Amino acid sequence: MTSARLRKSVARVTRPAVPLKDIKGAYPQLAPDKDYPPLKFKSLKGKVSAAEWQARVDCACAYRLVRHFGMDDLVYNHISARIPGKEEFLLNPLGMMYDEMCASSLIKVDLDGNVLWEPEFPKGLGYKFNPAGYVIHSAVHRAKPAIHCVIHTHSIAGMAVASFKRGLLPMTQTALRFEKVAYHDYEGVAIELEERERLVADLGDADVMLLRNHGTLAVGASVGEAFNSAYRLERACRTQALAMSAGEEILLPSREVIEKTNYAYRATTRRSYGILEWPAMRRLADRIDPSYKQ
């Protein structure tokens, strides 16, 4: 990298969502020997609008499903849901496992990062939202009002394919579900507000994006639509990583077949994703543990 390019690169990294010198204070500092009982939350049902409550239930359900299908990463990563008709969205408290998440545990923030509501935690658990989560999710919700859900994962397969130079290959029918796959180059931990503009520009009108050397991003007009994209992208990445690890030459369909399949999978050709699948996913979550609705 030339000195001029280096100066330009350094100059643009100037305004983090949390100043780097204060980054430690942005995360809860916990006593490691403390006994932490199971988390319980006072229900917000009837205390928020019906639209917000539905968004909370669906978002919490998505967390449980991401955990169920093995796409989570301990307490990290994030799923957000926009509150319909508002410039506000829901984020997870950093420190909770995905299978602990419930409708009344989600933090409500506005597009500027102001906390509008947060749950009460036992003494010693000052869980807040992840600054990197705010940067990534506010970028999409600010620029794309039609997007109501954003899902970011660090799945093993997603990170692997995001690090392949060729990215996601059109090698399976599942991969061909995505006519457009966006890519965003890695810039370090996503705490710089300036990265939001570049992230949204790279996303364009795609439903999914591979964050180079990082993970995956899926967006949708509903939680069900975003989850469907996240799940399908994960399946496509797993298949590709497994196939490439075998060392065999990968057979790709012809360009004609790729375009034909892309067309068949367009929402305008058939239906928006999530309409058929999401009720079934909700029923699955209910069978596993309906406490996400609390």
What does each model-identified segment do?
Residues 142-145, 166, 201-204, 232-235:
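Short, intrinsically disordered, mixed-charge
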Residues 131, 186-190, 194, 217-224, ...:
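A short glycine-/small-residue-rich loop at the edge of a beta-strand within enzyme catalytic domains
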Residues 153-200:
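Class I SAM-dependent methyltransferase SAM-binding "motif I" and its flanking Rossmann-like core
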Residues 49, 56-151, 158-169, 174:
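An anion-binding catalytic pocket shared by soluble metabolic enzymes
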Residues 145-146, 176-179, 202-206, 210-213:
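Short gly/pro-enriched beta-turn/loop segments at secondary-structure junctions
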Residues 81, 140, 154, 199, ...:
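Divalent metal-coordination and catalytic microenvironments
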Residues 5-59, 207-210, 215-294:
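A conserved C-terminal secondary-structure "cap"
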Residues 137, 196-200, 223, 227-230:
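A general structural signal for well-ordered alpha-helical packing
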